[in-house]
A protein has these predicted regions:
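A cross-taxonomic marker for long C-terminal extensions/tails that follow the last structured domain
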Residues: 633-667
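Short aromatic-acidic-glycine turn motif
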Residues: 15-16, 596-601
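C-terminal structural cap/anchor segments
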Residues: 576-579, 585-593
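Short edge-strand/loop segments of extracellular domains
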Residues: 521-524, 592-598
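Outer-membrane beta-barrel and related beta-rich outer-membrane complex signature
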Residues: 379, 599-609
């Protein structure tokens, strides 16, 4: 027999009476509207219709219950609406159980099995949820989560999570945010067991920054698979995954880079323990498209505070050219414009131990370079192939590290150096990089321009913090000026260049020398000393020096520079000469002829060009008389005194006669000539314009 019924009922304190429910429900009564039939013979209750209303939700459903020693449910279906998320908060793992949730969810359930050991399958859905915690906020969150629950575990399969406007902003710590985040995942949850979550994450518009704003990432697009295990009892989280970034900009101290061209991939297998704030990295590998793969393993203590690291970093396929382009050129080309003119190649390997806090990080290990190359983009010069094996010990800190024992020594071998039409044979030396100091232990010998250049005692006291500070000695031995001027595309002249500079020092933006360079040319000698270079690594270096001229044959000098023909001997000095962008900007000069008993004559062409330089006028109108019968004239004195500063050139002659400054003083014997400087003060830029005109003048201003 069967009993058909339709009734209403109220279950008092429903949540307190049903201990088997996996979720703790709010206290209150449960109101039921039931319709169905009951078979006395089978002790079976069939619910054709169920409507339920309680403080935590409303629901509709159908089902079958067999009453025996333990009531058993079969073919039961329930649809819950307007479920407040607070009912699940206490059952979430830390830190999710400490956040607040606003919004509602819907759930569809299918139940079967003994009343005290139900098997439940279903699906939970929600949209437009909001999440807020002490350090985190989510503006909008939607979730779709199929699940299975039994007495042993709660298992979610194929979870779909979409979140927008996520912000993580703890005080005085790293902060992060994202415009959009999508997660597809599955996880298992058992009471007193670690939560296991695996799936895939896709994020866009992601960004982060350090507490001091020195490290910033923006517009990041990140995606990849992951697996996360959260152990509430041990307060630990294990994360493994492979994450790729398709776009984004990164600012890390002075470095700025666009990740779009590099397609970075981060491969992780790490554990984080909250109580000890420690990250153990079994595998933390970073790959950049043009740089290579860097493998990292070890531990980071005080991870969320100023970290202290104990890591091993290594690579077998590191590209110095890719590193130079991505990390150095764009970051430092304004400070060092020379970088824009360089190209670097080769393959590097390294194995480095990193220890200490990030603001005083110690690095020790070995690096090697094969088939290295350094060249000008214009291909004017090339150094390579280069082979390097270098042990190193450095400290990334503002202050220099304390002195240690004797440094380990490595080797540097350069197979070839090409400069213009010169090729320098192989070079080998030993070197060390210890306590931030880079030292070459053997001199470098360069066979070039028919002579030799020796660079010795090359030393950077603090390569990392002050790379501009360098010291070395230099010695040149009989370089052939004919080959040198040809290589530099200067006017060709012969002679040799010899010099010894026992000390060259560069500090900040100034390079100073202590010594003298001597050039034997034009039949005489030029000695250069007090050489200084201001801003040597900029696009506009300034060179300062003093020069002494002895026994210069004017005939060789004038013919070399196509200035007509002048015979005689020139001597004098040029003090405080400053060259900027290849042009003099300051000098004090006293150059004059010296009578050594030889011929002293000057051609009409040379006279005319001197006249144009001194007056700005061609001498043709003044040329006449007997001068037309001669192509050269005798002189007794020739020269000038000049001072240049701030584009103002003050020009004085080799002899003063009243208010006249004589540039050329004629001899007692004819044919003779005098040239007067008609311009004693002139803009140096105007003098350069006159130089452009001298080839148009062929007659002197004759008195």
């Amino acid at each position: 027999s069967a009993i058909t019924f339709a009734s209403t009922a109220t279950l008092m304190d429903f949540a307190g009476g049903w201990r088997a429910m996996p979720i703790k429900l709010p206290k209150g009564d449960l109101a039921l509207n039931l319709a169905g039939h009951y078979s006395v013979a089978d002790q079976t209750l069939v619910l054709n219709s169920l409507r339920m209303s309680a403080p935590f939700a409303s629901a509709t459903g159908t089902g079958r219950v067999v009453f025996g020693a333990v009531p058993t449910i079969s073919a039961a279906k329930l649809i819950f609406r307007d479920l407040p998320l607070e009912i699940a908060q206490a059952h979430l793992p830390p830190p999710l159980n400490r956040w607040s949730y606003s919004g509602q969810a819907q759930a569809s359930l299918e139940l079967q099995g003994p009343w005290n050991a139900l098997d439940v399958t279903g699906r939970v859905e929600s949209s437009m949820l909001q999440v807020r915690g002490d350090d985190i906020a989510v503006a909008s969150l939607s979730v779709a989560a199929p699940f299975e629950w039994n007495k042993l575990a709660l298992r979610f399969k194929d979870i779909k999570v979409q979140a927008t406007k996520i912000v993580y902003s703890p005080n005085q710590r790293w902060q992060a945010a994202a415009d959009k985040l999508q997660i597809g995942a599955a996880f298992d949850y058992q009471a007193d067991q670690p939560l296991k979550l695996s799936g895939r994450i896709d994020g866009s518009g992601m960004k982060f920054k350090s507490a001091d704003d020195s490290k910033v990432g923006e517009n990041l697009s990140v995606h990849g698979p992951f697996e996360l295990i959260a152990d509430a009892a041990a307060t630990s989280v294990s994360l493994s995954g492979k994450f790729s970034a398709d776009s984004g900009e990164l600012l890390w101290g002075k470095f700025f880079g666009d990740l779009k061209t590099q397609k970075p991939v981060l491969e992780l297998n790490a554990d984080y323990t909250r109580n000890s704030d420690r990250l153990d990295c079994r595998r933390c590998n970073l790959a950049l498209a043009s740089v290579g793969i860097v493998a990292v393993g070890g531990a980071v203590d005080h991870f969320s505070e100023p970290p202290n690291v104990r890591l091993l970093a290594s690579s077998a396929n590191f590209s110095p050219g890719g590193f130079f382009e991505f990390f150095l050129r764009e970051t430092f080309n304004r400070q060092f414009p020379l970088l824009d003119k360089l190209a670097i190649a080769g393959q590097m390997a390294f194995r480095l131990q990193l220890n200490g806090p990030l603001n005083a990080l110690g690095i020790a290990g070995d690096i090697s370079l094969k088939n290295g190359e350094l060249r000008a983009k214009s291909n004017d010069w090339r150094i390579g192939p280069i082979a390097l094996d270098l042990p190193l010990q450095i400290l990334l800190a503002d202050s220099k590290p304390a002195a240690a024992g004797a440094p380990r020594v490595g080797t540097l071998a350069i197979e070839r150096i090409r400069f213009a039409n010169q090729t320098i044979p192989p070079i080998t030396t030993t070197l060390s990089l210890s306590n931030n100091a880079l030292r070459l232990h053997q001199p470098i010998h360069l066979a070039i321009f028919g002579g030799e250049i020796e660079i010795g005692s090359l030393f950077w006291p603090d390569l990392l913090n002050d790379p501009k500070q360098v010291a070395f000695s230099a010695e040149t031995k009989r370089l052939k000026l004919e080959e040198l001027t040809q290589a530099l595309n200067w006017p060709r002249f012969s002679g040799t260049l010899t010099g010894s500079i026992p000390q060259v020092q560069s500090a900040e933006n100034l390079l100073r020398t202590n010594g003298e360079i001597q050039a034997e040319l034009f039949g005489g000698r030029i000695r250069m000393g007090k050489l200084e270079i201001d801003n040597p690594f900029s696009s506009l270096p300034s060179i300062k020096l003093d020069a002494k001229l002895d026994a210069i044959q004017l005939e060789q000098l004038s013919q070399t520079f196509a200035f007509g023909r002048i015979s005689g001997i020139l001597e004098g000095s040029i003090d405080n000469l400053v060259l900027t962008d290849g042009q003099p900007s300051e000098l004090r000069a006293d150059l004059h002829s010296v009578d050594r008993g030889g011929e002293q004559r000057i051609s009409v062409e040379a006279l005319n060009k001197i006249t144009v330089l001194s007056s700005g006028e061609d001498a043709g109108a003044l040329y006449g008389g007997l001068a037309g019968f001669f192509d050269s004239f005798r002189y007794s004195k020739l020269g000038f005194k000049a001072t240049l500063k701030n584009d103002r050139l003050t020009l004085r002659g080799v002899e003063s006669r009243g208010d006249q400054e004589m540039l050329v003083v004629g001899s007692f014997l004819p044919p003779t000539v005098n040239i007067v400087s008609h311009t004693q003060n002139i803009a140096f830029s105007e003098l350069l314009r006159r130089l452009e005109r001298i080839n148009k003048s062929d007659k002197p201003n004759v008195q």
